[in-house]
């Protein structure tokens, strides 16, 4: 499915929508220039809503009623809008807007910016002979979703391999599925050297709960091929003995920096590799062709556009990913604004000068790629918290399942001192830091590092971030506001299920468990909340993500996860995933709210998410997505229908086998949602 819109009928030379230029006054302060500085090649179609009678007839479509002042000066004739969205419930995201009266219409200028907002009647003046007018039918128009932590190219690459869809299975059931994959990927013709790589393995999904993966289970498959299961969480890999042999992994293999080769009581590898140890095997897997990757990535970027995502921070980027973005942009198949976060490994984190030179080199090489804006650095501070991985760094030890402390406090991949020096070097050079911090010790390490950087650089607006925040010590809540650190959360995980209950509660105990994903506690402490999906760790379900932030259950949870204490309001949730994340990415002067002068990065939904029942938010469909005034998704186009159908299938596949555990009794269905990269 192509990610660009289907062919559109041009109205006239004047109907083409040009995205905002880098010199836009709307982005003149702290935000970076728009990546859409070149004129758009897309024109807007009439969609049968604009009467051929001209401006007067079109004005009638906007409805009558008492006039109200639009929030921009009048325009007419040649200055008419390219597009007017009318009869809408506009969520502007601008504080105090509602006190001035409801906003029901948005006019998009021919420069790709928002021309005006106001009532239907007030915006009649912006309708010209070739203006397109769209009836929102009372549904929401709002800023596009800003995804502050996502891996879209990883989603594309994963789509090229068979997927276990994070299923919970017995070893026998798993072998049956994998045997089918062997047949589907070449069968006898792939013997003995064709790799079977399977995505979305559930590291806590072997039944009965607590069953540990071992290469001997995979060795029972009827094949001599190397077999590798890639964890859906991005932190675990499970290999058969053939793959271990090819990689030369033995009892004598040491743990690499930032990773772990899991070994059994006999000292031999079990076949499970954690975090950076995965590279021992992954580097040997044959790569897909560039053409295959570009096509797959273009398709998943189209899915993101169909979900209403207009800006993404790709949270794991190196040369490989930047070359893919370059190819996508050159082909006109990059529909979103992309902020690439350059990933530094644990060794690089100890070398600020070398790392800064590395990041600057990549920026120089790729900064002309249209659609990219550089300025972000990514570092892993720890792993994941769930059993059996337990590599997230904790202040207190993990428990053994019977409530007794163990010797394990997880893995801290970078010290506070090293992270502080690294952050200071990059902040001083104008870059932002983005830390993977899942456990409470990793979160504190990030905050300690940012405190050091703030102290030595004197900067008060560095806008560094900590992502995931699965467990935060109460003593650290206020430090986010004090240090100006963004709390980037993936709140689709904040529901009761296998991952938050069976794989976690017995191993950290109820006192710590209460502080899982403490969103409202952070909000009360003054933290700036920002949102991210971590896709493809989960299937892309943007609106269920927002719904779960509000009710702490979502569409597939087994019950509420501390809703009374940690649920967010609807308003906070909408802002978190729009203007909040725009602030994190330093583009709040460009996008994130619906107000004149900002880029027209907008979504038109199929319901009013500001008023519908909370549970109904999960099923929200996106009728139209615009980026810089350019239509990148239309639900009623052939491409749009295909994308919507695929998203619906992914949402349906998201349901997981029944899991009846809960924190305080009850039951229901669990689902995969481990923290990822």
PLM segments and residue spans:
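Divalent metal-binding segments
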Residues: 52, 69-73, 80-87, 91-360, ...
């Amino acid at each position: 499915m192509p990610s660009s819109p289907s062919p559109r009928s041009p109205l006239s030379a004047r109907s083409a929508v040009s995205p905002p230029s880098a010199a836009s006054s709307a982005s003149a302060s702290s935000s970076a220039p728009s990546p859409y500085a070149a004129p758009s090649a897309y024109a807007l179609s009439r969609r049968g809503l604009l009467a051929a009678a001209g401006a007067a007839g079109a004005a009638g479509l906007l409805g009558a009623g008492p006039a109200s002042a639009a929030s921009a000066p009048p325009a007419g004739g040649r200055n008419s809008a390219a597009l007017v969205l009318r009869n809408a419930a506009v969520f502007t995201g601008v504080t105090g807007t509602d006190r001035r009266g409801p906003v029901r219409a948005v006019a998009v200028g021919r420069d790709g910016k928002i021309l005006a907002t106001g009532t239907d009647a007030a915006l009649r003046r912006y309708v010209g002979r070739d203006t397109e007018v769209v009836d929102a039918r009372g549904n929401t128009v709002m800023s596009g979703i800003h995804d502050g932590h996502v891996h879209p190219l990883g989603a594309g690459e994963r789509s090229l391999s068979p997927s276990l869809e994070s299923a919970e299975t017995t070893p026998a059931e798993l072998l049956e599925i994998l045997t089918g994959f062997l047949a589907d990927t070449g069968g006898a013709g792939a013997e003995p050297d064709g790799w079977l790589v399977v995505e979305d393995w559930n590291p806590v999904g072997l039944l009965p709960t607590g069953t540990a993966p071992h290469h001997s289970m995979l060795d029972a498959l009827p094949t001599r091929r190397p077999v590798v299961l890639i964890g859906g969480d991005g932190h675990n890999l499970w290999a058969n003995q053939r793959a271990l042999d090819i990689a030369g992994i033995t009892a004598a293999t040491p743990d690499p920096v930032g990773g772990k080769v899991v070994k059994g009581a006999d000292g031999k590898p079990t076949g499970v590799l954690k975090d950076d140890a995965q590279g021992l095997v992954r580097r040997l897997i044959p790569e897909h062709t560039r053409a295959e990757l570009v096509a797959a990535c273009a398709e998943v970027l189209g899915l993101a556009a169909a979900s209403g995502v207009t800006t993404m921070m790709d949270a794991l980027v190196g040369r490989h990913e930047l070359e893919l973005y370059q190819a996508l942009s050159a082909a006109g198949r990059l529909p979103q604004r992309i902020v690439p976060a350059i990933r530094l490994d644990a060794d690089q984190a100890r070398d600020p000068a070398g790392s800064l030179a590395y990041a600057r080199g990549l920026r120089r090489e790729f900064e002309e790629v249209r659609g990219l804006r550089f300025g972000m650095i990514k570092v892993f501070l720890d792993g994941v918290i769930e059993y059996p991985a337990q590599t997230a760094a904790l202040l207190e030890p993990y428990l053994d399942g019977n409530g007794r402390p163990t010797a394990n406090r997880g893995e801290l991949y970078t010290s506070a001192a090293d992270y502080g020096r690294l952050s200071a070097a990059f902040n001083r050079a104008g870059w932002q830091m983005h830390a993977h911090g899942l456990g409470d010790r990793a979160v504190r390490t990030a905050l300690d590092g940012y405190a050091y950087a703030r102290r030595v650089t004197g900067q008060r607006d560095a806008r560094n971030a900590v992502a995931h925040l699965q467990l935060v010590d109460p003593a650290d809540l206020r430090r986010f506001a004090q240090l100006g650190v963004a709390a980037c959360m993936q709140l689709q995980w904040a529901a009761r299920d296998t991952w938050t209950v069976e794989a976690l509660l017995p191993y950290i105990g109820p006192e710590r468990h209460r502080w899982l994903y403490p969103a409202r506690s952070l909000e009360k402490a003054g933290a700036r909340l920002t949102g991210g999906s971590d896709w493809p760790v989960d299937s892309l379900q943007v609106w269920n993500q927002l719904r779960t932030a509000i009710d702490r259950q979502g569409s597939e949870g087994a019950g509420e996860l501390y809703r009374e204490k940690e649920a967010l309001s609807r308003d906070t949730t909408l802002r978190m995933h729009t203007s909040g994340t725009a602030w994190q990415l330093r583009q709040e002067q460009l996008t994130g709210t619906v107000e004149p002068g900002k880029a027209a990065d907008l979504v038109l939904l199929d319901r009013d998410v500001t008023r519908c029942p909370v549970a109904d938010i999960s099923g929200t469909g996106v009728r139209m997505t615009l980026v810089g005034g350019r239509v990148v998704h239309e639900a009623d186009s052939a491409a749009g229908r295909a994308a919507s159908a695929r998203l619906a299938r992914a949402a349906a596949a998201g349901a997981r086998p029944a899991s009846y555990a809960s924190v305080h009794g009850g039951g229901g269905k669990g689902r995969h949602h481990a923290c990822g990269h």
